[in-house]
Each structure stands twice: as structure tokens, then as C-alpha cells.
């Protein structure tokens, strides 16, 4: 099911052509307490992992050049959005704590797992998501598409629901047949989605793809693919899984993948597998990645050092390796020469109390997969290790990405126990990479939502994620005022165009902010240009307004500093778009070192 919002006419940058390497779309998944009380949601971590795996498998087999990456999951217990309804989706999207979490983890898409809604006549509503839209066949999202990339998934429905609702956020509709029944072809209504062909497909009585409703085609068969007329598969009754210029969700997604992956700047570092290419020392000149502190009972579960960790039998060599791209994030490489366990002794726990054990694991050997286990192990008086399945977790793990293992349990000590360990191992004794190990009391307060940052800054050294063109295209450029990179707004169609980014979830209502940015127009051969910045703000109970942040006339080809100050009104913020613009549309505009400081 979809839900459309009226989008502004601000346009995002033209999507680049589909790349061979899939684009990474970061997703945050929250879940309600009630969802965990259902058969499908009792092991909510496994359910979320299955959602991601189903979607990514469908993308891969369909030919879609993007993959979902789970950057955060958390129980939502500060508000009640119990079922899949439009009202709950709207409230969820506008929840300030959800918005802050989205910014903290840089989630391009945000999902809430709750319960389905009885919609009458024997039907239930399994999911609902806002439709990411743009001008028809333009290849550009409207400016607020990134701000409405939220969806709800009923835990009591199938795994395909999650991929379906994320598809709406990415600009996909249901099917041609369902478009005929809705207002899509009614000229009184604006275009919905990205392209006319950005939709699912089905054949009467045979099958429907992920975005199409099977009952609209008189079938129960849902092929686990996105519509692609170039794909012929038995799941599609040995027929094409789409129709050229009619139903081609894969073509639409590949065209928009870069924009979707840039809905928000990346906050959780990407990871690599240095273990597969031999031991790789942590580069000393890289800055540490910015990550939330784990706390808990294991001390340094982020592995700034190896203190306390050892191989139980001495059959493995331990070393620290960097697993991040562009910053420093240690993981522990467990290079096993014979079967062994990675262990760390811990202080005695309270019998009968609840604890949560978690960590991330990847196999050293790329393109391999096997079962990895994480557990509390008790050492008995005779030196033997006792294993309790209730205090352990297992997961099929690959050598291509980190997988998170997590288990909540009530602690029960073994008889004649003399020592207690946290342990990690693979069933075959394969070498592992381990990170973010944590053991904490289950009754501990849930992860806190951080306050709005005092400083918001963009230096574009890691790219222009989260930024887009305003009636222009946007890209990273080496024409920078400082450092290596800046943002270039080019192919500007009008005067008063440039680039923008959403600040929703980063601003605190009622506060004053000082703004500054380095700006430049042209290459030195043109005339002077006016540069200026606005904060477009929509807050509860007030109409949308453009709050000026400053203006300056600049010499062509020269960098100048644009400065100003703004007082935000009180009340919940519904939309906040920072826009930096200029005249002389025939020239590129360059932007660098953007900053807002809370005063």
C-alpha cells in the first residue's frame, strides 16, 4: 500500500547511470513491543535480518543495483503506533525522536515493524509507505522525497511486505492494472512515483511481482522479483517478469539508485574484510570512526586493544585490523590454525537476572558462509566448558559483510561453575573477524536518543551524501576552498538555483543558529553574482516559510564567505531544508565548509 504526499518543486540531482557495484541504501528498523509478542516477532532480530535478506536477494536476482544495509534497529517504546494505518505512519514520520535517530545513523529509509490492520471484507493492511515522487520520467526526485522515506510493515505478514513498502519510498507503484483503478491517469492529480513504468507487473491467473498485488491478477503467486522485462524465470511462469516501457521497476530503481543512497549522509562507516587478503595493520594516520559507545560489562568491546581476549586452546592468533572505509575502526581477527574458541572471562552474573549478549561477526574467507555461535560458557571445577543453548545464539554468517548476533536470556549458572566466559566460534573452526561485542543487563535503560547537535557541518571530504541540486544537478568537485573536495551545482536551469540538504532531525525548535558557508560562482570569466541562503521551515501550526540566512555579491571565480543568523520558531518541526543559491545560472556554483552553530 502506498501513501502520497504533495512534494515541492525542488528537484534532486540527475541520477547517474546504473553502476556495476550496487549502491548501498542504509535503513533503520524500529519495532513495537507488541510486534515482539507475535509468532513472527518473538525473535525480532532474526525477523529483521530475514526482511533485509529477502529484499537484497530480490534485488540481486532481479538485476537491481542497490542493496539494503541495516545501520540500526531498536525497540520503539516512547510512543504507540500499534498498527499499519496512515495516521500511524504520519505520526511515526513526524516523531522527533525517530527523526533524531535517523540522523544519528544516517538512514536513507526508516521502517517500523508493528501489527497489520484489519481493513474489512476479509482483507488486512500489511504495510504502508510514503511514495517517493518526482516529475514524470524526469529521473529526479522532488525535494522532500528524502524526508518522507518512511514505511510501516506488519510483522504478521510475509517477508515481501518489507521490500514492497521500501519500494514505495524508492518511487515504485503497484501495477498498471492498479494504476487504472486509482487516480494515476486522472489529469487532475499530480504524477506519483518516478517514471510511468516504475511499477510492478503481473499476468492474470499466473503471478505478480513484489510491488503488484496478487489478488489484482486472480492469483496467490507472488514472484520474488521486481518487474524486469529482460528477466524470464519459472517464478514468472517462464514469461518475462515485466513489460518494456510499461512495467520495469528494475530500470527505474537503477536510474534512481544514486539518489536513494544519498537521501542521508552516511554515518555508519562501511566495512571491508582485511582478513581475506592477509593480516592488515590498522593505519595509524586515519582518524577514528565516530561511533556510539557500547558500555556494558565487557569493557572494550570495540577493540581499541585486545586486553582480556584469548584463544581458549591456543590454536588461534589474535590481531587487530581496521575494517572501516575512510576511518579507523578496529575489529579482532581470530586466525584459527585448528579448532578454537575466542573467549573473554567476565565477572559473576546475578542468577535469574536478564542479560543481552550481542556482537558482529564476519568470516575471514570472502565468499564463504557457515554457522557462527556466540554464548556464555561456564568453566567447571574439572576445567571442562559447559554450554547452555538458552544462553547462546547462532547465525549463518558470510565472509562478505558483518552480521549481528544478539540474544536476550535469563542467566542460570552451571553446577560447580568456577569461571564464566563470553565466547565466539564457528562450527568448523573457521577464522573470524569480531567487533562490537557487548554484554549488558536486559533491564538497562533502552538506547537513549541523542539531543540535536550543537554543530552541524559539511566539508564534503567524504562526498555530498544528503545534498541535492535545486533545479540543478549536484556532484563532488576538486574545486574546493579548503581540503580536497567541495560541492558543485551545475546544469542550473534558472537564476536562484543551487543545492540543498534536509536538516530535519538536526535542529532544535526555538533555538538560534549561526550560519556560514564558503561559496563561489564560475571560473573567473563571468560577471559578479548574488549568492544567498535560506532555511525553508515548516513547523506545527505555521505555514511554510523561507527564513533568510544571509546574502553576498561575489566576484566570479573567487571564494567568499556567506554568513547569517536565524531564530527558529517554537513548536515541532515538520520540514527543514537548507538551500544555498545564486544567480548567473549559466555558471556552476561551488559550496564548501557549510556550518550551523547552535547559540
UniProtKB/Swiss-Prot annotation:
Its primary localisation, in coarse terms, equals: secreted
EC category name:
hydrolase
Catalytic residues, chain numbering: 165
Q: Where is this protein localized, as stated in its record? A: Secreted
Is Zinc given among the entry's keywords?
yes
- The residues listed in the UniProt record as binding Zn(2+), with positions renumbered to this chain, are 164, 168, 174
In the induction comment, the record states: Its transcription is positively regulated by Vfr, the virulence factor regulator, in a cAMP-dependent manner. Constitutes an operon together with PA2782. Is expressed only during biofilm growth.
Q: Which GO terms describe its cellular component?
A: cell outer membrane; extracellular space; outer membrane
Q: Its Enzyme Commission number?
A: 3.4.24.33
Activity regulation field: Is inhibited by BamI, the product of its coregulated adjacent gene.
What is a single molecular function from GO for this protein?
hydrolase activity, acting on glycosyl bonds
Annotated stretches, region: Disordered: 265-285
GO BP, one example?
self proteolysis
The protein's matches in SUPFAM superfamilies, at most eight in alphabetical order, are given as: Galactose-binding domain-like (SSF49785), Metalloproteases ('zincins'), catalytic domain (SSF55486)
Q: What Pfam families does UniProt report for this protein, alphabetically?
A: CBM_4_9 (PF02018), Reprolysin_3 (PF13582)
Q: Which domain of life is it from?
A: Bacteria
Kindly indicate where the leader peptide sits in this chain.
1-20
- Entry domain remark: Has a tridomain structure comprised of an N-terminal metzincin protease-like domain and two tandem C-terminal carbohydrate-binding domains.
Quaternary assembly: Interacts with BamI, the product of its coregulated adjacent gene, which inhibits its protease activity.
Q: What does this protein do?
A: Metalloprotease with endopeptidase activity. Specifically cleaves on the N-terminal side of aspartyl, glutamyl and cysteic acid residues. Mep72 appears to be a secreted biofilm-specific regulator that affects the processing of a very specific subset of virulence factors exported by the type III secretion machinery as well as flagellar proteins. Binds directly to ExoS and PcrV and affects the processing of these proteins in the biofilm secretome, but contrary to expectation, Mep72 seems to protect these targets against proteolytic processing/degradation.
Tell me the protein's name. Peptidyl-Asp metalloendopeptidase
* Protein source organism: Pseudomonas aeruginosa (strain ATCC 15692 / DSM 22644 / CIP 104116 / JCM 14847 / LMG 12228 / 1C / PRS 101 / PAO1)
